[in-house]
Amino acid sequence: MTHSVPNIGFVSLGCPKNLVDSERILTELRSDGYNIIPTYENADLVIVNTCGFIDSAVQESLEAIGEALEANGKVLVTGCLGAKEDRIREVHPKVLEITGPHSYEAVMEHVHKYVPKPAYNPYINVVPSQGVKLTPKHYAYLKISEGCDHKCTFCIIPSLRGDLDSRPITQILDEAKRLADSGVKELLVVSQDTSAYSLDQSKETQNKTVFWNGIPIKNNLITLCQMLGTLGVWVRLHYVYPYPHVDDLIPLMAAGKILPYLDIPLQHASPKILKAMKRPGSVERVLERIKNWREICPELTLRSTFIVGFPGETEEDFQLLLDFLKEAQLDRVGCFKFSPVDGATATDMPDQVPEEVKEERFQRFMQLQQEISAARLQQKIGKTWKVIVDEIDEEGIIGRSMADAPEIDGVVYVDNVGQSAVRIGDIIDVRITRADEYDLWGTC
């Protein structure tokens, strides 16, 4: 007897947090017996998981919805842009249903409505325990919370994803262990505000002892990182705001429990601009803490992101930012030109910076940081570093050191002269022989 299995097309846009949402939806679809396909034409329904963070992302999402409608006609929309249903309906009124971010149950209800769950499920015994993953098998994103309590004037995330909502620590650890047991070698911890984990919960909940694998633990970030560090995999922290308790993470890094890597979105170094952004932090205190962190953990890699051309930014403000870069000597830095976002307070602020000035400052910023990054990478030459293997081809190995997150940082190009049996996901020793502004070269 032939059984018909419905086909669902799927498009995932946006940041790693949205990717985790996509993985959750795909896991639910596969568990219910739906077949996931990479095309629109043969799909019984198409789901588009959108991004709505900045206007360019909104445009990309609207274009993806339009392509799906043109090629198929039966489209569900979810994700951050889904929180702005009127915006979507104005452009694409024929979309069947729209839900906001992390609305897994609503998405599945809509799928069942338009494409009923198949009576026969060919995947009932083959859905992996760790769920469907969109990343390579050797690394995975681990989302520890939803939403954000900050009210940064350039951002609309709280209006899209809501206030901070931390997952129970035992639930996170269960997922992390499943991933590690499935062969994942690197966990990338993500959220909108990783260092705020559990701060949305009552003191009673934070201090309450719970048990995981028979071990008594508390519900806080430090304990979470300590326990993740027992799983035998790389643990990399992203989106870590510089709260005071972040200092307590550095000894864990120095001891090798979690990777010596901090992704801290500092955004600017002018007190005036930071105040206008509604961003916390004393620049002098940040510099002092960076110095202390590096004394405790000399191998610490610091990544950050900054915005140039924020409304009201003068040449003096920008120079303060350049001065900060020179003193902080950050390893990895991303820079964005301020972009108006529909619904963000900063969009309507006075003293908007002309586009040509933004571009000029962006170029000066990047030139300086490239010099800093190149100098810091030069210090790695002659040393041996652990490298996780991402790709293998006839020219050699491409991997990442402990200082490199996937997609946003550099890579290590390796001449494989002594380890013919190297496989993707292996962690190997590489002696560094050359460096440029972003990448390293070496031999194993």
UniProtKB/Swiss-Prot annotation:
[4Fe-4S] cluster 1 binds at residues 15, 51, 80. It is found in: Cytoplasm. One of its GO terms (molecular function) is metal ion binding. Residues 378-444 form the TRAM domain. Its cofactor is [4Fe-4S] cluster. Residues 134-375 form the Radical SAM core domain. It is an enzyme of class 2 (transferase). Residues 6-116 form the MTTase N-terminal domain. InterPro entries: Elp3/MiaA/NifB-like_rSAM, Methylthiotransferase, Methylthiotransferase_CS, Methylthiotransferase_N, Methylthiotransferase_N_sf, NA-bd_OB-fold, Ribosomal_uS12_MeSTrfase_RimO, rSAM. [4Fe-4S] cluster 2 binds at residues 148, 152, 155. Its main location: cytoplasm. Its EC number is 2.8.4.4. It holds the Pfam family UPF0004. It catalyses: L-aspartate(89)-[ribosomal protein uS12]-hydrogen + (sulfur carrier)-SH + AH2 + 2 S-adenosyl-L-methionine = 3-methylsulfanyl-L-aspartate(89)-[ribosomal protein uS12]-hydrogen + (sulfur carrier)-H + 5'-deoxyadenosine + L-methionine + A + S-adenosyl-L-homocysteine + 2 H(+). Transmembrane segments: none annotated. The keyword Transferase applies. One of its GO terms (cellular component) is cytosol. One of its GO terms (biological process) is tRNA modification. Keywords: 4Fe-4S, Cytoplasm, Iron, Iron-sulfur, Metal-binding, S-adenosyl-L-methionine, Transferase. Binds 2 [4Fe-4S] clusters. One cluster is coordinated with 3 cysteines and an exchangeable S-adenosyl-L-methionine. Belongs to the methylthiotransferase family. RimO subfamily. Catalyzes the methylthiolation of an aspartic acid residue of ribosomal protein uS12. PANTHER family: RIBOSOMAL PROTEIN S12 METHYLTHIOTRANSFERASE RIMO, RIBOSOMAL PROTEIN US12 METHYLTHIOTRANSFERASE RIMO. This is Ribosomal protein uS12 methylthiotransferase RimO.
